Amino acid sequence: MSAIVGLCLLSEKVVLSRSLTDEVSKLYKLNRGNVKEPRKYATERMSTQSKPVALQVPVSTIVLDYKDEDFIKQNPTYSAMDIIGSPSNTAPQTAFQSIMPSLSALFNTPFIQGAFRHRIISSMGPEISYLVMVIGPPSGFMDTPNVSSAQSSVHTVSNADVDLNDIIAINSTMAKSTKLVSASTLQAMLVNDVYDRCMDLDGILLSQALPFFRNYVNVQSKGSLPPAVAACLNTPIKELFSMGSGKREPLTLEFRKDNEGQCLGIVLPKGHEGDTLSSRYPAVFINESEPFSDKERSELSELKRTDSDAYEKLYSETISKHVSDGSYGNRVIISHKMSRLSNGGVKIIGRFKISDFNTVKKNLSSRSGEVDSAKEQWEALSGNGLVTDSNISMLHDKILDTITSNKPGVVLRDGNKKSENIVVCFKNGFPNKKHSLLQLTKNGISVVSLDELTDAGILVESTGPDRVRRSPKALANKLSSFKGRKVTLDVDNMSTEALIQKLSAL
């Protein structure tokens, strides 16, 4: 399924005054498995009044707009921004476009926007998903008003020009600038709170989006927008599909098989312990020269001594040859130079280096003859999109985050551990306030919804009276017919490490 989804990270509890559309209900069912049927009526207590509402959504996400695959196929020249909307658009056409400029004007601060795109090549063909999330306001909030009326409610911390203690003024501003004034309850947050709040969101959706978005929030909070993100947002949907190894041709939406997908690679100079990554995660990473034959290595070694330009040309051609014959498989290629990957037909998904070259020199203390070439490679990496860190372990973590963002479903497990993926479903919902879904994913544990659970997976039921949740009839039937393994765990009183250890031992 291809989908573009507009998400707002605004409150722990969202009360909508309208029913979910069929498309949005379908989206929640696919990813959560616990969509509540719209109630005919309900009330939300605010101050001394009760406000009528139509539905309570049991997650901290507002789905303001959702476009499915059919819509995308019918409008292949639309970009994500065309579909979801620009925050500067004063004449909005969709719910998402409508509410964001209004909130930005109301709070007198920019709302941080991020877009995450992941592309999956499957037996069913290319699939593309967008998560467009909004976090704001990002900083400088002091007052904590609680404003309510029959038309709107806002609980936020802000330094807005509007006097947030003046209920009449705030309601007047909301009514004038916000077309969806009664659509949601809003709660602002600081950038430092992004990570914790993200973990409270839809776990299945965010397990891939979080690493990218976390970095994007940090960059955007410093006042710069990565060109790649801007380009991604404004590229026609049909041009986001490319075919074949080494080709970048725009396509319309059509099907193809797994083994026809483009190889992915990262650039990591010498002295950055690339061998550690490939040995620890052999199913995920492969060094650029690993498939080379003895004859190829000998030819390259001879050229390296006599003609450096010819050496680099042959190196790229050798990589291209092994890309074409499938020697790299579905693994991410680690290369010391960008040119080797790009000339070899490999898609570069990240460039990484240690911020201080002295650290690289220490790592090469036993290989002093390689320091000069390592420095040349290190200095060649610069510009937008370069990821750096002063610590090698932290840099490797950032690499892993990039891999999970670009290769959804990848299992990051140590090489000495069993390679099969562990699929689990938490009957009462993933305990995201207590545990990190990202850590489970990195340890080879995939958390799925009840709809996606097969008899080969594990059903986890959480203890405690507060973990009881009523299931819709369809999901109740799924539970009764489940023949796989079941386990009861006190997940609320376990550390994430203990939970991972327990699930891995099952």
Swiss-Prot record:
- Cite the entry's keywords alphabetically: Capsid protein, Host cytoplasm, RNA-binding, Virion
Region annotation (RNA-binding) ranges: 128-249, 325-355
Q: Subcellular localization, per the record?
A: Virion; Host cytoplasm
GO cellular component, as recorded:
host cell cytoplasm; viral capsid
Family in the record: Belongs to the phytoreovirus protein P7 family.
Functional summary from the UniProt entry: Probable component of the transcriptional machinery present in the inner capsid. Displays dsRNA binding activity and may play an important role in the sorting of viral RNA and virion assembly. Together with the RNA-directed RNA polymerase P1 and capping enzyme P5, forms an transcriptional complex positioned near the channels situated at each of the five-fold vertices of the core.
Name of this chain's protein: Protein P7
Source species, please?
A: Rice dwarf virus (isolate Akita)
